[in-house]
Amino acid sequence: MMATCTPRKRKRYTLNADNDDSLLTDISSSKLRCAENLFPSPNKKHNYQSSVQKEDKSCSHQLHFPSSPLKTTENSRFSFANHSSLFKPAMSTVSFYSKEKYYLNPLERKLIRECRSICLATESGDKPIPSVTENIQRKPVCTKKNKKKQKSLTAKYQPNYKHIKSKSRNLKNSKPNQVTYKPVVDQENSCFPAKNYPNSPPRVLSQKIKPQVTLQGGAAFFVRKRNSLKKLPLEDKPLLLQKNLPEVPEGAPEAKQIPKSLLVDEKSSVKVQNARSKNEEKLRKNPSGAVVSSKECNLDKHDFPSENSLDENKTISPESVYPIFNVSSVNTKRPEEQSSVGSTACTNFLKQTNVPKNINSRDTNKGGKDQLVIDAGQKHFGTTVCKSCGMIYTASNPEDEIQHLQHHHRFLEGIKFVGWKRERVVAEFWDGKIVLVLPRDPSYAIKKVEDVQELVDLELGFQQTVPVCPDKTKTFLFIDEKRVVGCLIAEPIKQAFRVLSEPSASKECSRAWRCSDVPEPAICGISRIWVFRLKRRKRIARRLVDTVRNCFMFGCFLSTNEIAFSDPTPDGKLFATKYCNTPNFLVYNFHN
């Protein structure tokens, strides 16, 4: 391209002084036209598009270069004569990067800016619009303000602003070269600082992050609270609240985007804090001099919005509104001018209020039973009854367990009945049988009777004595499932004594009772009658006595007036009264 244009040296045309003014005016007019084409007004959009199309066509014509340098000179002469302008090169002054934009010199840019500012001022009338230079000068001021805010606010809780600068050569924007600040409206608040809303989570890279909850436990919570109360007096609280409030201009457009509910909540919170500060001042500045914890909180009804969910009867009390943060009368320092009367009144009042709190729970449980054994959920705990031997003992007690093992082994061996070859079965029942053992029976039978008699004597508390007629005693054993569950020892007697009836008022079973001195004739005396504990209430004792009455004397059935009981226990007395159908049954002394 350059080879075709530079073989010859071009001649410089001299210009007259008269033509200088015309050339300068043409240059300024052409520059103004270019500025108007580059920055069209909103009313001249259609004209601008047509002009752009014409310029594109002219540029396309200019790109077709002439074949010889002579023609280029001729074309330049024609253009100079017609347009009365300076030298125009063959190549159009198109920007290197974009073919649609023209390159402008610094002087041309300055003229365009001045012309553009004048045109915008004339179109808008009295409303001045800041130019690009003015906006550039205002930028450092905005950054300074933001830097000051960063010092006062933490980086986490600072509101996010998007700095958007409109492009100067954008064809669609009606107002170019303007700097706009659009705040990012969060879900809750954007204009007010985050310190007034501690519940709102902080944002990091436009993402919500829940702050880690740290609870001060123990004495650290109260120590920190006291230090804060000492450092910050109560009179300075409303001033601090006013300082913490953000400075919002009256004509700011961002204030319109704030929901009304947030403003109402903020006002109500400020009023509640002011009411708390007033109540705390009343605690300290009491005219009587005595520190009295006033629990009355005077709040205006208009401070809170009415809601349908709240009942009309419910009144707002200081206990319902964070009682932890109320200043207690004990922690506050008393003034130096406090009188002795006020101090006594304060102590008396505090004693009256703290009486129910100082009551110890242990004092109320003094009348209850003392727990001597720790109940840790053991399976075997407390008093238990052995199902096989019937002994009552305390589990988890080593002494009782040892005694239980000894008694259990001895008892099971004593009541165990294997069976004999020659059994003297006196009566048979569906649940067992009764076996009679005489003194002349084999030794294994007599030995078994002695073992059972020893167990019976231990359980009944009977003295081991020698009977009057050992050769005539008869032992009746009730056998059930190869075990001895009942035993009756009978012996012949000659006389017995009648038990005197007691008044109906005292029907308690006691060992001491009275009997008559007049003896009565009797034939059979029942020295011992015993039934296994787990087999009682099954008519075993009754069947044993019936068998004795039938078998004690051959060919004779004894009546209830011919049998007597020897020193019965309370249970034996009830049984004798029930069996004989009278409390005046016969008893005898087996020692005689």
Curated annotation (Swiss-Prot):
Cellular component GO terms held in the UniProt record: cell junction; chromatin; chromocenter; Golgi apparatus; nucleoplasm; pericentric heterochromatin; site of double-strand break; XY body
Keywords in alphabetical order: Acyltransferase, Cell cycle, Chromosome, Metal-binding, Nucleus, Phosphoprotein, Transferase, Zinc, Zinc-finger
Which sequence ranges are marked TM in the entry? Answer: none
Q: Keyword check for Nucleus, yes or no.
A: yes
Task: Write out the catalysed reaction.
Answer: L-lysyl-[protein] + acetyl-CoA = N(6)-acetyl-L-lysyl-[protein] + CoA + H(+)
InterPro entries attached here?
Answer: AcTrfase_ESCO_Znf_dom, ESCO_Acetyltransf_dom
- Entry EC no(s): 2.3.1.-
Q: Which residues form the signal peptide?
A: none
Q: Where in the cell is it found?
A: Nucleus; Chromosome
Question: Among its keywords, does the record have Transmembrane helix?
Answer: no
Q: Where are the zinc fingers (CCHH-type)?
A: 384-408
Alphabetized Pfam families for the sequence:
Acetyltransf_13, zf-C2H2_3
**Family assignment?**
Belongs to the acetyltransferase family. ECO subfamily.
UniProt protein name: N-acetyltransferase ESCO2
**Which source organism does the UniProt entry give?**
Mus musculus
